[in-house]
Regions:
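Active-site beta-strand/loop signature of hydrolases that rely on acidic residues for catalysis
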Residues: 40-41, 56-74, 135, 164-187, ...
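Surface-exposed cleft-lining segments at the edges of enzyme active sites
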Residues: 115-116, 141-158, 194-199
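Surface polyanion/phosphate-binding segment centered on an Asp-His-Pro turn
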Residues: 268-291
Length: 291
């Protein structure tokens, strides 16, 4: 969650010795038998590098999707990240937005942004294909205020995203969509929901357009496994005691089409990085699939 002419998405693999758009990678490894996919709104990658590197070392996800990296491509911290052994794909801009995907295996294809001829999506959408599975990473606009043009832009962004799914994916084939959606879908996904009816991340129109996008063919795997569990992924900086009081929001999500959702075996929110020194206001969410 945030209030606030780009180059091609860059894909970097650690064994490459030269830049060529999408670089050559390490030799392929065997296909996954299980895939652990994580998402994290990092709220400035350069500021949270120690948190990201520590989490990669401890949790060893197969794929990590990052949002709000807040760094233009020319300043992306490749040197700090490549020793981790991950293939790194990113698309950013100065000071705002930005998405990246770190993966153990080289993506078979990389795509960025909408291709509908509309306005720039400001480094908010990145799609890769890994082991034949499309993985879409999104940082959805927050919307600012209900009466703001930014809120209408957010609603329209979801409409564009649903059409993007219709064009590029199939609900009958495995696919993952994850990221900071800036929507708390249910009353239990936000503290004191009655006080947030006009908040851009809980307003009725935002929830409706989000559910309409899901109805294309995605299922929230957290809700699938734990339909009655109240757990948050975001705690506002502006309320210093929000974490201790657990006054948060569940606005970061991992979703999958039916063929993959039914193979989801575990979903967890790791709250410890939110307790770290100089943390993001979000924390890591991860899911494991038997593939």
């Amino acid at each position: 969650m945030a209030f606030g002419g780009l180059p091609e998405a860059v894909s970097f693999q650690s064994t490459a010795c030269s830049w060529c758009g999408h670089l050559l990678a390490s030799p392929p490894v065997n296909s996954f038998t299980a895939m652990k996919i994580a998402t994290f709104n990092v709220n400035s990658l350069r500021k949270r590098l120690p948190i990201v590197l520590d989490w990669l070392e401890q949790q060893k996800p197969d794929v990590l999707c990052l949002q709000e990296t807040k760094v233009q491509d020319s300043e992306f911290p490749l040197l700090a990240l490549t020793p981790s052994g991950y293939h790194i794909t990113f698309r950013g801009m100065k000071s705002y937005n930005g998405v990246a995907i770190l993966s153990r295996k080289k993506p078979e294809a990389v795509f960025h942004g909408f291709d509908d001829g509309g306005d720039s999506e400001d480094a908010r959408l990145l799609r890769v294909i890994i082991d034949g599975i499309p993985i879409v990473n999104t940082y959805v606009p927050q919307g600012f205020e209900i009466d703001s043009p930014k809120y209408q832009y957010k609603l329209g962004w979801y409409d564009r995203l649903r059409k993007y799914f219709e064009k590029h994916l199939s609900p009958d084939k495995p696919a993952v969509w994850c990221g900071d959606m800036n929507v708390a879908p249910r009353p239990m996904d936000v503290h004191s929901p009655e006080k947030h009816l006009k908040h851009v991340c809980y307003h009725e129109d935002a929830r409706k357009v989000y559910e309409k996008t899901l109805a294309w063919g995605f299922e929230d795997v957290f809700v699938r496994l734990y339909p009655n569990r109240q757990q948050y992924t975001f705690w506002d900086y502006r309320a210093p005691s929000s974490l201790e009081a657990n006054k948060g929001w569940r606005i970061d999500h991992i979703l999958a089409t039916a063929p993959l959702a039914e193979k989801c075996t575990r979903v967890e929110v790791d709250i410890e990085p939110r307790r770290a020194k100089d943390p993001s206001d979000h924390t890591f969410l991860w899911a494991e699939f038997s593939v």
